Amino acid sequence: MGFSNGLKHQYKPVSILELSHKQGDIEKVASIASGGNHLVVLTTHGSIYTWGAGEQAQLGRRVLERRKIHGTVPEKVTLGTRARKATTVGAGAFHSFAVDDKGDVWGWGLNSMGQTGTGYQSSEDSVVQLPKKVKGLSKEELNGDRVVQIDGGTHHTLFLTANGSVYACGRSNAGQLGLSEDHEAFKDQVDPDFVAEPALVSFPDPEDPIIQVSCGSHNCAAVTEGGALYSWGQGVQGELGLGDVEEVRTPRVVVRKDGGAWFAAAVSCGGQHTVGLFRKK
């Protein structure tokens, strides 16, 4: 939980992260990303703190097996060098991410299905122990665009850029990447069931940029600037909002931009359910 390495239950909220500095230097928590059993916290100073379970390296720092309890209290994570400051953090079930002030994207944790986006050549790449740059998503590689949001599912990840583009990597067995079966990302892959480097996801209306994404365990959803809502992936429990469909491989419209009575404002995917925030037009 981040405040004790011996307590098993806490029934009332308590303060977790103490950020003390010299007088006048105020550091606060800016955002929090949660995985299956770990947390990633970004502060207003651009620092990253992680805590929780670290067996899959999702904490981004070394935790000795005989001292696993040390992972349950907050400690800083370094992105290459201490000079780099983070601007965004994200997490999947057992993997984590950060974007630094230069626009580089970093991933770490479980990578057995390529979900960190750092590449996969052999079983040695199944776990990324320390933050490693994600392939193809630096500010230079995106021609000045930059990643502003990252969300992950059990074994997959979505990256959203400032210009409204979405990239995906990881497991694709249930269509959770939003990539068609003939997408070039599947060519020459070590395993046809996953994509180890971020690939661009196409949407029905390319003129309506994406402003928010969310990942469930095996499904995804996205909201556009114009108020449309898309979903894709596994739908065996109705989590796609598309009726009785078990799988959708590419983004499909749930709420239209034009016509209809509702405007999609936000979406959040859970394990096997999805919640949307809508406004009357």
Language-model regions, residue ranges each:
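A detector of repeated loop/turn-to-beta-strand junctions in beta-rich toroidal repeat architectures
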Residues: 7-13, 66-73, 123-130, 183-195, ...
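Fungal eukaryote-biased detector of long internal structured cores
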Residues: 1-113, 123, 164
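Conserved core positions of repeat-based scaffolds
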Residues: 38-41, 50, 95-98, 107, ...
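Blade-level signature of beta-propeller repeat domains, shared across WD40, Kelch, NHL, RCC1
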Residues: 245-281
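Short glycine-/Asp-/Thr-/Trp-enriched loop segments that recur within the blades
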Residues: 22-27, 81-85, 140-145, 204-208, ...
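Structural signature of WD-repeat beta-propeller blades
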Residues: 30, 37, 75, 87, ...
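Loop/turn-rich, solvent-exposed surfaces of beta-rich toroidal or solenoidal domains
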Residues: 160-163, 171-174, 196, 202-238
